[in-house]
């Protein structure tokens, strides 16, 4: 029976697991999107979302609490200066998990985990697809185009051969 087994240990000791989650959280904050297994992504989501919530109020105490979990100055400043400003009006759900299939070597289920407000690539492709779509037929599209102006003809005389 699975009593009192609240979280996934990920096959690691407690110190290894906390170090791995801290490093993955720093990578997620720096790069905004990382590729990992689904189990690690779910554990990372539980780890990083309270830190993002804590970063919304920029106080000395909240910075110390976040730094004790991340241990990376660059990640902490990035979190408090850029990410917290972008997610200030969002009440939670700062990360998204997108499953990408199975890994070739061991068939592990892989996914992307990304910050929700930093998905510029997905937003650009969605608008690009809408812009290129048209319902006009080719015949009517060709008729509406202006006919090309006739090109000025220039004739060059070849030098006379003797």
Swiss-Prot record:
GO terms for biological process: translation. Gene3D superfamilies: Ribosomal protein L17. It comes from the Bacteria. Transmembrane segments: none annotated. Coiled coil: none annotated. SUPFAM superfamilies: Prokaryotic ribosomal protein L17. Residues 140-153 have a biased composition (Low complexity). InterPro entries: Ribosomal_bL17 (IPR000456), Ribosomal_bL17_CS (IPR047859), Ribosomal_bL17_sf (IPR036373). Residues 126-162 are annotated as: Disordered. GO terms for molecular function: structural constituent of ribosome. Keywords: Ribonucleoprotein, Ribosomal protein. PROSITE patterns: RIBOSOMAL_L17. One of its GO terms (cellular component) is cytosolic large ribosomal subunit. The keyword Ribonucleoprotein applies. Residues 130-139 have a biased composition (Basic residues). PANTHER family: LARGE RIBOSOMAL SUBUNIT PROTEIN BL17M (PTHR14413:SF16), RIBOSOMAL PROTEIN L17 (PTHR14413). NCBIfam families: L17 (TIGR00059). Belongs to the bacterial ribosomal protein bL17 family. This is Large ribosomal subunit protein bL17. It comes from Phocaeicola vulgatus (strain ATCC 8482 / DSM 1447 / JCM 5826 / CCUG 4940 / NBRC 14291 / NCTC 11154).
